[in-house]
């Protein structure tokens, strides 16, 4: 947390934005939206070796309990309305991580008539994690980048 100033009497001054964003980065609750093989790597990231719980990241089963959606895998046209519906059920503020080449831009199945060429056509994406499939380390790096993005945002309307 960045502290803007320390007064000589022992007081610490900072902005409310900084405090709110700092607390949000320590308690991200992602909802898994696993569609294909990238979901296995997402489960790998939540297992004992990488243990996302140590960063305050706890996977939630319901969109109403989560604030981050990780879209992992090939998004087809039939699943696109369900993705948008689940995204709309999430509480504000909400963020989206697109994991893997298929979620980012269609991947190997890019030219198929049934594939959406990137989940960013359906929901706004904050962080893209490349790879086919991306490793658990890449997902962890993407989550850290999302935390850095959250720290830089202004939360209070001026």
Swiss-Prot record:
One Pfam match, by short name? Answer: Oxidored_q6
- Binding residues for [4Fe-4S] cluster, per the UniProt record? 37-38, 102, 132
> Among its keywords, does the record have Transmembrane?
no
Which keywords annotate this record? 4Fe-4S, Cell inner membrane, Cell membrane, Iron, Iron-sulfur, Membrane, Metal-binding, NAD, Quinone, Translocase, Transport, Ubiquinone
Membrane-topology descriptor? Peripheral membrane protein
Q: Which PROSITE patterns match?
A: COMPLEX1_20K
Q: What is its main location?
A: membrane
Return one Gene Ontology term, BP aspect: aerobic respiration
UniProt enzyme class: translocase
Instruction: List, separated by semicolons, the cofactors it needs.
Output: [4Fe-4S] cluster
What is written in the cofactor note of this entry?
A: Binds 1 [4Fe-4S] cluster.
Its EC number is 7.1.1.-
Q: Does the keyword Zinc apply?
A: no
Function field: NDH-1 shuttles electrons from NADH, via FMN and iron-sulfur (Fe-S) centers, to quinones in the respiratory chain. Couples the redox reaction to proton translocation (for every two electrons transferred, four hydrogen ions are translocated across the cytoplasmic membrane), and thus conserves the redox energy in a proton gradient.
What is the similarity comment for this entry?
Belongs to the complex I 20 kDa subunit family.
Name under which the protein is recorded: NADH-quinone oxidoreductase subunit B
Query: What is the scientific name of the source organism?
Result: Methylobacillus flagellatus (strain ATCC 51484 / DSM 6875 / VKM B-1610 / KT)
